[in-house]
């Protein structure tokens, strides 16, 4: 096989990954995302929901979920990752405003702490409705915390 053709399988995978990233980028720019709510129950009383974990889902143009495993590691350290965190926070806080007894955990990257638009979303909602802070749980991914521990320490102090 001529060297310039490369490995066909590797080329197909790279092409698929590029197409997936472009779909994610387009979906995020159009805010074509939704939250999936995973209940977290109490150990003492498994029939009682303690809170919900709000998981962001990016939708393609046919409204199907693009599996996060296909893009998350590539975007974690990019602006696109920060934009997804902003959308998750905005959608989660909006749901909490609409449902006053809703307690949510929202996943995020530690890098989003230093991302001005993310902090603006958080501050805008908390300034309008301070009780949201009592019901909001921010779940910072372990991998991102290990990469920028100083940001997390400053945010939590």
Name each model-derived stretch.
Residues 25, 123, 152-157:
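Short amphipathic alpha-helical segments and helix-helix/interface helices
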